[in-house]
Amino acid sequence: MKRTTLIVAAVAGITLAIVTGCSTGTTAAAPAARQTATDVAAEHVFVRGPDPYEFLPRVPSFTLTSQTVRNGRPLPIAQLSGILGVPGGKDISPQLSWSGFPATTKSFVVSMYDPQAPTGSGFWHWVVADIPATTTSLPAGAGVPGSSSLPSPAFQLNGDAGAPRYIGGAPPKGSGVHDYYITVTALDVPASGVTASASGALLGFTIDPHTVARATLICPTSAGQ
């Protein structure tokens, strides 16, 4: 009889504990779902990033045109990179012309930047510094190594490919659309203050307080276009 009483008491205690847990809203945690390789791939969605100049102080724009690239259109095959493995790419820098910049301009910087490059920091394809204010255009192909088409004292930085030249666009297959920003920046100083070994990021940091205007062509390009 005593043994039966103990069993009944134990069952009653367990029942009370369950009821108490339910009455306070406590529930057992569900086991965590296992993440599969398919789930990870599904989460890896390529998103077009914001304008890289959006976070800089606002400055006026001016007119920038080109005979070889068009704003809002993909880079032509000649402006893509055979060096980086694009079939048919020729790494020829585009022709550029600009006008309407402020009278206080004393030099220009020309660049091409891909903010969507899979690096975590974008990719500088071309950077030319210390272009004198009397220059208002660059011919196609001015971005070759040791270019004679650049006006003195302009020079090319190494860029992210490690070479002082134009490196064409090279969007990796399956990485979506890359917005190539071809930009002419007007400065109120005759020299940028950097050397050819500087990164595009360092140049940008250095010239930011001296930027008086900026003009940009955006060429959205994906692999195979």
Roles of regions detected by a PLM:
Residues 7-13:
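Sec-dependent N-terminal signal peptides
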Residues 2-7, 22-225:
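N-terminus-centered regions that define maturation/targeting leaders and the start
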Residues 17-21:
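C-terminal motif of bacterial Sec signal peptides marking the signal peptidase cleavage site
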